[in-house]
Amino acid sequence: IKLSVFFMIKKLSKIEYILFSLLCIVSVFAFSNSMTDTYIVPKWCYTILVFVLYLIVISIKSLYNKILNFNVLTMSYIIVVVCTFQALYGISQWLQLVRFDNKYGITGSFDNPAGFAVSLCIGLPFILLCIKSISSRFWIFVMQLLALLFIFAIVISESRSGMIGGMAIICVELYKRLPIRINFKVIITCCLFISLLFGSYFLKKDSADGRLLIWNCSWRMIIDSPMYGHGFDAFRAHYMDYQANYLSQYPNNEYAMLADNVISPFNEYLNVALSCGFLGVLILVFGVLFLIVCYYKDYKYEKRVALLSLLGIAVFSMFSYPLKYPFVWIVMYFDVYVILRGSFIWVIPSLVKRILCVVAIIAGMVVFYKLCMRIDAEYKWNAIAYFPTNENVRAYKDLMPILGDDPYFLYNYAVALYGKGCLEESLNVALQCRTYWADYDLELLLGDIYLDKNEHIEAESHYRKASFMCPSRFTPLYKIYSLYRRIGDGKEATAMAQLILEKPIKIQSNTIDFIKAQVRRDLDRKSTRLNSSHMNLS
């Protein structure tokens, strides 16, 4: 055992494994309170930064014909160790040993349970490869305990997608091991999945029904551009418009009160269809078939493990958004590398290899520089995001060349300009943001800007759009009510007031209490004035 540990440490000391370890660590644990997005943006920024360093290092080694170290078992151990620390972190939150403030419950080092659960799901199969390489019963027992630890952490996260993904991996792995007939295996597997699906549905029924609405509206988007899709990041750019149009046509829809402000279709396959159309889905299918061919062409147990990891991602992708997280991409590319490895022999001429290495080094340095600028801009944005002074508004303008394609930055910039009374500039930035992002809050902001510009028809249009996007919200209706009062349309104002008072409440809040109380006071005052005028006349 001591000898094997020594050789493992010796392997890990090689630069490729150090960088791969760092890549996995930052993609899972990186966060920054000095960025406006505490979890996701830091993970992506620092993961890409380490990946670029990784690319430069292997390009330099290849240029000088040095041996590249890509031992699958060693890299699998790295993934398992990183996932183990993540599982322990989540369990520590569950036991309240670690203080955390997150409304979603057990999230580990992620923004919600989905990231936590998917990282453990895709790391689970690599424990099997580690067990396969170990002869010591003690270490096999330790690895089996780790597998149980991963499964337990997924369960306490209450991630339904994680439970289904984990169950898929376990069922496929146990399929050949169970000493029963194939027919019984199929029946048992189907029963387990159906039970898990129904259980997941009724565990959080409102959430599941909300996803059905999202998938319904997403299908309408696909129908409008079935072959080539709507382009990159199409869901964020257009989905809320489709949801608003659908709910305006069917205002009494049973899912209307569940509609919310969303930026993901909760299904990665739908996302591909929305962005790239059926052509993109077809390419994805051919890619999967190609990997299966490579798997059977040169079968090895490590390829089976990689395929199980990809299965976890594939199942998780049916109900959530695993590709939002950089660690999933790292493991997915690693899985693909393992499956392709040995299936084909690539012979690259020496000159071409050298040219590719030089290009990779130069491109890596350029990306590294641009990324450092982006990270610096993210820190500067966070420093000014919550204090819209004149100086900070000028700082927003200075950051536009770097962050001008980020809809969240543009929205905050438009809000800052609006707060300082720069209506025209605020409108221009908000409309620029609108090309990237269809959003409830953005519609309210546009309505406020047009209202202050005395363009009441445009203001009402945006308020109504916001109301149809999220029918359960009271703020758009109250803004329309206030607009009618402002222009002196008493009849429409009274009708809107009655609508607000009769509207059912989805989630009780101080804002809703204030709106209803204010509208009720206004109606009481109006009623008092009318009674007084009738008494004077009589």
Each model region followed by its residue ranges:
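Short coil turns that delineate tetratricopeptide repeat
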Residues: 403-405, 437-438, 471, 505
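Hydrophobic alpha-helical transmembrane segments in integral membrane proteins
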Residues: 200-213, 359-391, 408
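Single conserved hydrophobic/aromatic residue that forms the stacking wall/gate
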Residues: 526, 530-538
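Interfacial juxtamembrane loops and adjacent helix segments
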Residues: 101-103, 232-274
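Alpha-helical transmembrane segments of multi-pass inner-membrane proteins
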Residues: 17-33, 46-61, 65, 70-102, ...
